[in-house]
Regions:
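Transmembrane-helix motifs of polytopic, lipid-linked glycan transferases
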Residues: 74-95, 133
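Extracytoplasmic catalytic/substrate-binding loops of multi-pass membrane glycan-assembly enzymes
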Residues: 12-31, 44-59, 66-70, 215-218, ...
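Juxtamembrane membrane-water interface segments immediately following transmembrane helices
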Residues: 11-36, 193-299
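Membrane-interface anchor segments at the N-terminal boundary of transmembrane helices
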Residues: 69-75, 290-291, 301, 307-310, ...
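Multi-pass, polyprenyl lipid-linked donor-dependent membrane glycosyltransferases
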Residues: 48, 71-79, 103-133, 138, ...
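Short hydrophobic alpha-helices at membrane interfaces in multi-pass membrane enzymes
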Residues: 99-100, 137-159, 188-192
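Membrane-interface alpha helices of multi-pass inner-membrane proteins
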Residues: 105, 150-164, 175-176, 196-205
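Juxtamembrane segments of multi-pass membrane glycosylation machinery
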Residues: 37-48, 52-78, 95, 113, ...
């Protein structure tokens, strides 16, 4: 707690302030005016995103219209304190020695990226909090598989699904099936917790299917594939593929452009009388991607993506390589922080080099592309987190071995194995979704998983130290 408070005071004096501007300008949000005046209606007709985060922020904006930024700041600061305690508690559940757990927790909470996300009104911080809380809830269920503990765990999983489409219905179904298999005597408890959650998620998907012909919680998938395919084409490649009939001229337009860019490609959707659907732009001036016209564009972008996957997959390979490169970047290395990161430049560079292994830093992603274009591809790994590039796969392999190899699996208590398996599955599932279906901001998507990576690092360090001390207990990590 002392390290958390001291770091926040120092960051404040360095000029780090809470940024609530995303509420007004980020694509993920509905219009703030609609949050205040037509929140329930707007959430019902929201299809571009799951409704959970807009519900939470919308309630703050609705009840504190002139001071919502201050209220959100307090909420995020409280989340920061809770995240620190949850991370420490999670390692204690695994019986990681106090000095290791405390050291890793301090490094996590003083990390510039963690502090910057704590001061940005976007959903990374709440998702990180929910993931840590869900892990602890699962540990409680594994130790005492009651209906109450099952309800607690699946309620938190529901909150994750309603907040970001990265946590898909398939994710929930797999978790439910796994718990049914692992706890055969507690199947009633698992089903009582899981079935209502699955039904609610299915209802959300069904609502979007009925209204928008898309069985999903988020209709961005089609256009998002364009980011990983046609957006990766050079202008010359795009022209050649258009002339060859491989893709349509839409390939020349970056995905998620404003509606004016698509005149002549699709007809505007008819007015509905529902502002969250009818707006071309929000009252704050950014494109309203919830406009049904974009649904037609999603289909067109997806058709182009399918052609790219089949006839010119090199474009998709570029996206995957960029995604993995970005995945290992320090969490502070994001364009969202371009205005504030210079205020902590010295400490950020020190932390990124010593902890993450980022030995060189580019001013922007455009600079990285210029380095590659100039024949400097072999130098690019020094611009990402080299320690992360090596360390995170090793942690995944180590955790997998703990579950797969009988001679080490038997050292763990059942609740420890279940929790480790859950963290590992969540890391692999969310990472695969992020890195194969998106590009550029993958270190942002990784940030919510860094809590799990930190816990696994604590387990691995403890196991390494214990292995070098003959005669110590071998049960679990100790």
């Amino acid at each position: 707690m002392a390290a958390f408070l001291a770091s926040r005071i120092l960051y404040h004096f360095a000029g780090i302030r809470f940024d609530a501007s995303p509420v007004a300008i980020y694509w993920q949000y509905i219009d703030p005016v609609l949050m205040r005046t037509r929140l329930v209606e707007s959430l019902f007709y929201l299809h571009m995103q799951p409704p959970g985060f807009n519900l939470a922020v919308g309630l703050v904006v609705k009840f504190f219209p002139s001071s919502y930024a201050a209220v959100l700041q307090i909420i995020y600061l409280i989340l920061g304190v809770l995240i620190a305690f949850l991370l420490l508690h999670l390692m204690r559940l695994f019986r990681v020695p106090e000095w290791i757990a405390a050291t890793l927790t301090v490094l996590f909470v003083v990390n510039p990226g963690c502090v910057l996300y704590e001061n940005l009104a976007i959903y990374e911080y709440p998702i990180l909090f929910l993931l840590l809380l869900a892990a602890i809830a699962l540990f409680r269920f594994s130790r005492a598989p009651t209906v109450r503990h099952s309800l607690e765990f699946f309620a938190l999983i529901l909150a994750l699904v309603l907040m970001r489409n990265q946590f898909h219905l398939l994710y929930v179904l797999f978790l439910a099936a796994a718990l049914l298999a692992v706890f055969p005597r507690a199947r009633r408890a698992v089903l009582v917790g899981a079935l209502p959650v699955i039904a609610l998620i299915f209802s959300l998907y069904l609502k979007n299917w009925i209204l928008f012909h898309a069985f999903t919680a988020s209709t961005w998938a089609g256009m998002a594939t364009g980011v990983t395919t046609t957006f990766q084409l050079t202008p010359e490649e795009a022209d050649r593929l258009v002339r060859g009939g491989v893709v349509t001229p839409l390939a020349r337009i970056p995905p998620f452009s404003d509606l004016k860019s698509y005149v002549g490609y699709v007809d505007a959707a008819p007015a509905t009388g529902i502002p969250v659907l009818d707006q071309a732009e929000t009252s704050t001036g950014h494109a309203n991607f919830n406009n049904p016209t974009y649904l037609k564009l999603h289909d067109l972008y997806l058709a182009n993506s399918e052609s790219i996957w089949l006839h010119y997959p090199v474009a998709y390979v570029r996206s995957v390589l960029i995604a993995w490169f970005a995945y290992f970047l320090p969490t502070s290395d994001m364009h969202s922080f371009d205005d504030v990161r210079p205020r902590i430049q010295s400490f950020d560079r020190f932390f990124s080099a010593v902890i993450f292994g980022q030995f060189r830093q580019a001013d922007s992603r455009k600079d990285l592309r210029a380095i590659k274009a100039a024949g400097g591809a072999l130098r690019l790994p020094f611009y990402t987190g080299t320690f992360l590039m090596v360390g995170l796969p090793l942690l995944i392999l180590w955790a997998s071995a703990q579950l797969a190899l009988r001679r080490v699996r038997n050292r763990w208590k059942k609740e420890e194995s279940v929790l480790l398996g859950f963290m590992l599955f969540t890391i692999l599932f969310a990472t695969a979704i992020s890195n194969f279906l998106s590009s550029f901001e993958n270190n942002r998507y990784r940030f919510v998983l860094d809590g799990y990576y930190t816990v696994i690092a604590g387990l691995a360090i403890t196991a390494l130290i214990t292995a070098r001390r003959p005669g110590r207990a071998t049960r679990g990590v100790l």
